[in-house]
């Protein structure tokens, strides 16, 4: 930056503020633009591809205030943090303090990836979490908050499970202590997922400091009556809130006390399974082709977010799962009803996020109007649902609530064409306030009032060419030609030109004052009325939150019904047994590509481990993933892609299917494989579901076979989990001779006329061929290479010397 003694007062004000917010891009409000200067300008102009200019030696660029959210969106998505500096008064107000007084400006909030609430900056069906981690020995406390909805949770976890927890939560921004990043295991996870990181010294996470923050936020002197927070949990929740308060400059919505995420209530899906099963994105990072893209039929933003939360943490209670399944079954059996419900839901706004914007005084008239329309829509939902005397449906009706008084207030006060900003007015119904009606009348009738005054002056002066005109210098004025001078003391001379003379009158000045001030006064009054409307909405906040959650749940359940009807899914039997019996199961994503071969599986207590052999390309990996996905779908309360499914509650899902070199962490393919397998054998229980594909393939034959053999023994004898193990080691098929609960299966293959046909069908028994050369041929190997491979294979079978 330049010498502060040689810059203008405005730039001095900027420099002073920038010193306080060095780590942020400073959006400095100047009139209708946000301006950036010095290094901020150079960096931002490149990122946003906007013009970089100079004023003297100062680099600068700017974005229009009215379209600033578009630019903020791009910066936030790239992980930048922006300090928003606004004008706190008008230039007229500043001049009242002195002719050369500078307009007061200050930073009113800090926009970071994890603290945004504006619809234009948020993905409708994506949660936008800010998370915080505090470590104690080998454990971590995690807290996560979605400011746009108020969802606030915390959880204790072991460092070994941090990868899975962070992948499940998916925070947009992560708040950590500097020394936490010095732990290699933590640093590698954070670097791998490229979270936006905000670092503080360890003192920021002090427990006493956090305790005081929590007490201040919730207005209590002790936390004893609010929950079971203790020790490091206090640190993580309080520190997260302190950061939010700092970014919002104290404008914090009323938040519920943080809720403990109890792992035993939910299925644990480890990080490898979340990735390998492609629940939320494919291996290449695309949404298309993922499980959620295939099953998401939700029509509201909140329903979409709920579905994603449920998929990342499926239920682990048979009663809770069956409650959802019963609701889905009800809708499947009443298709006209659920289709009508979904039609109503399509017209419903994201009132969960609207309510937060109301609470922090950052909502628009359009938000309130959308809220009103949605509350009206809830009556339509109740009317559709209340005809059915079923417990879960009756519960939905009670949660949807009634809002006659609030709807009446909003209806009487808001115009239908409510705008997105309060600054220009024009959104409050003039009929709701007599003073506002007068201001609007003056504005709307200003031309008529001026014309009436002009006609009267023409009659008084007998000058029919007399005009009343307006410019920015004189305001309104009377103009006549130089040939028609006015000899009347009520007409005060203002200006003489070559051909015209201009006058004013006391009456004209008063009318001008009314016209000009009426606009400002009406906007001020509209803003005041709008503030009262927001206060009225906040009185219903708790009730609206309950309604919003009910809407999301109804949307998700009717979405499951639509999925079941469209693709002929069946209702699974869920209980506390150890069954996993699927008949004619299908992969919920792959089946959409066309003809799909169904398969059965029965992982009963008598044969809880299935060993599958067969060639690559025969469908082993698809079969493994398919059954894990069927289990997960059942646990979120969805029907499943199978003719029949009986599944005992699963507590954890582990997947070791496919691997790629984890270059970011410096791990080889084989190391990744071993780490993921270690997670399985260290954490799986008899209620877990495990799929393992080609364990040991990344090392020598004997090493790999030995590792695979011992892993199967461990899962069979110690973990006792339900497991499917696919392998190319045909020697492992001997294990069913001495391991009591293993059964061998293989992929059915037919050979005909020298050709191999993969039937993608699972049959009992073991495969004695891998058909690797045939797969190479299908992949496009030159015939000469294929022939040579066949020749060498024949030699190997007879133990001949390959070099002779």
Swiss-Prot record:
The keyword DNA-binding applies. CDD domains: ABC_MutS1. One of its GO terms (biological process) is mismatch repair. Gene3D superfamilies: 1.10.1420.10, DNA repair protein MutS, domain I, MutS, connector domain, P-loop containing nucleotide triphosphate hydrolases. Pfam families: MutS_I, MutS_II, MutS_III, MutS_IV, MutS_V. SMART domains: MUTSac, MUTSd. Keywords: ATP-binding, DNA damage, DNA repair, DNA-binding, Nucleotide-binding. ATP binds at residues 614-621. One of its GO terms (molecular function) is ATP-dependent DNA damage sensor activity. The keyword S-adenosyl-L-methionine does not apply. Belongs to the DNA mismatch repair MutS family. This protein is involved in the repair of mismatches in DNA. It is possible that it carries out the mismatch recognition step. This protein has a weak ATPase activity. This is DNA mismatch repair protein MutS. The gene is mutS.
């Amino acid at each position: 930056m330049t010498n502060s003694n040689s810059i203008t007062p405005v730039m001095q004000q900027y420099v002073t503020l920038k010193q306080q917010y060095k780590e942020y891009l400073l959006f400095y409000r100047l009139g209708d633009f946000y301006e950036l200067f010095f290094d901020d300008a150079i960096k931002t102009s490149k990122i946003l591809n906007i013009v970089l200019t100079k004023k003297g030696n100062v680099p600068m660029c700017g974005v229009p205030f009215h379209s600033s959210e578009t630019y903020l969106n791009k910066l936030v998505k790239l992980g930048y943090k922006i300090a928003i500096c606004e004008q706190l008064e008008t230039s007229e107000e500043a001049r009242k303090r002195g002719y050369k007084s500078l307009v007061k400006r200050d930073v009113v909030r800090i926009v970071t990836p994890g603290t945004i609430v504006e619809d234009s900056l948020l993905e409708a069906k994506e949660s936008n979490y800010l998370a915080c981690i505090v470590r104690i020995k080998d454990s971590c406390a995690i807290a996560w908050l979605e400011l746009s909805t108020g969802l606030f949770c915390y959880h204790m976890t072991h460092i070994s499970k941090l990868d899975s927890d962070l992948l499940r939560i998916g925070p947009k921004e992560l708040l950590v202590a500097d020394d936490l990043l010095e732990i290699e295991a933590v640093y590698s996870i954070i670097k791998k997922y490229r979270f936006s990181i905000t670092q503080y010294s360890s003192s920021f996470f002090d427990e006493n400091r956090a305790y005081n923050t929590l007490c201040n936020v919730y207005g209590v002197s002790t936390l004893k009556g609010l929950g079971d927070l203790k020790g490091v949990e206090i640190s993580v929740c309080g520190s997260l809130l302190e950061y939010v308060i700092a970014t919002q400059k104290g404008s914090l919505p009323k938040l519920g006390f943080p809720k403990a995420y109890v792992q035993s209530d939910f299925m644990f899906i480890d990080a490898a399974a979340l990735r390998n099963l492609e629940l939320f994105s494919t291996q290449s990072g695309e949404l298309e082709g993922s499980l959620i893209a295939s099953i998401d039929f939700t029509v509201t933003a909140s329903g979409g977010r709920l579905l994603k939360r449920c998929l990342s943490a499926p239920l682990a209670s048979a009663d809770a799962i069956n409650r959802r399944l019963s609701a889905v079954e009800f809708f499947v059996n009443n298709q006209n009803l659920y289709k009508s419900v979904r039609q109503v839901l399509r017209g419903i706004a994201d009132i969960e996020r609207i309510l937060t914007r109301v609470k922090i005084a950052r909502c628009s008239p359009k938000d309130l109007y959308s809220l009103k329309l949605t509350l009206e829509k809830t009556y339509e939902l109740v009317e559709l649902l209340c005809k059915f005397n079923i417990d879960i449906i009756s519960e939905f009706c009670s949660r949807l609530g009634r809002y006659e008084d609030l709807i009446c207030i909003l209806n009487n006060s808001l115009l239908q064409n409510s705008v997105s900003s309060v600054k220009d007015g024009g959104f409050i119904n003039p009929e709701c306030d007599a003073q506002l009606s007068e201001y609007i009348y003056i504005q709307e009738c200003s031309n008529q009032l001026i014309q009436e005054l002009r006609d009267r002056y023409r009659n008084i002066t007998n000058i029919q060419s007399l005009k009343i005109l307006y410019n920015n210098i004189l305001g309104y004025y009377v103009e006549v030609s130089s040939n028609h001078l006015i000899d009347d003391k009520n007409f005060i001379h203002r200006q003489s030109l070559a051909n015209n003379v201009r006058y004013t009158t006391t009456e004209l000045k008063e009318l001008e004052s009314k016209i000009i001030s009426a606009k400002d006064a009406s906007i001020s009054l509209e803003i005041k009325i709008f503030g009262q409307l927001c206060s009225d909405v906040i009185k219903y906040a708790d009730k609206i939150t309950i309604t919003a959650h009910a809407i999301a749940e109804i949307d998700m359940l009717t979405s499951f019904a639509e999925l079941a009807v469209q693709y002929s899914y069946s209702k699974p039997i869920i209980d506390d047994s150890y069954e996993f019996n699927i008949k004619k199961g299908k992969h919920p994503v792959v089946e959409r590509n066309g003809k799909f071969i169904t398969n059965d599986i029965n992982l009963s207590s008598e044969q809880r481990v299935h060993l599958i052999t067969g060639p690559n390309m025969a469908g082993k990996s698809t079969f493994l993933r398919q059954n894990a996905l069927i289990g997960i779908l059942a646990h979120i309360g969805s029907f499943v892609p199978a003719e029949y499914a009986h599944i005992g509650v699963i507590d954890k899902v582990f997947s070791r299917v496919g691997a790629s070199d984890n270059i970011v962490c410096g791990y080889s393919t084989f190391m990744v494989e071993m780490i993921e397998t270690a997670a399985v054998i260290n954490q799986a229980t008899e209620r877990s579901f495990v799929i393992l594909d080609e364990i040991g393939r990344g090392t020598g034959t004997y090493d790999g076979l030995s590792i695979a053999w011992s892993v199967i023994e461990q899962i069979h004898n110690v973990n006792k989990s339900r497991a499917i193990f696919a392998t190319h080691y045909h020697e492992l098929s001997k294990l069913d001779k001495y391991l009591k609960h293993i059964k061998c299966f293989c992929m059915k293959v037919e050979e005909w006329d020298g050709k191999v046909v993969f039937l993608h069908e699972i049959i009992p028994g073991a495969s004695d061929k891998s058909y690797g050369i045939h797969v190479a041929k299908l992949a496009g190997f030159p015939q000469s290479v294929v022939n040579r491979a066949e020749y060498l294979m024949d030699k190997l079978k007879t133990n001949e010397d390959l070099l002779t």
